[in-house]
Amino acid sequence: DWDVAFIKSDYQNGKDMWLIYAADGTKLATTDNRDYAFIVAKQNNLTPRSVH
């Protein structure tokens, strides 16, 4: 399904970060706030899914 965004946590530069990827693996954005990552996905008409 192509209307999904995958949200993945990562540790970068001493901070917890949240990476947002399209279903095809394209990196869309990075943020330091998990809630904001989900908001960004929804604002772009994507269904966010958490990836571990």
Question: Where are the language model's segments positioned?
Answer:
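Polar low-complexity intrinsically disordered regions
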Residues: D1-H52
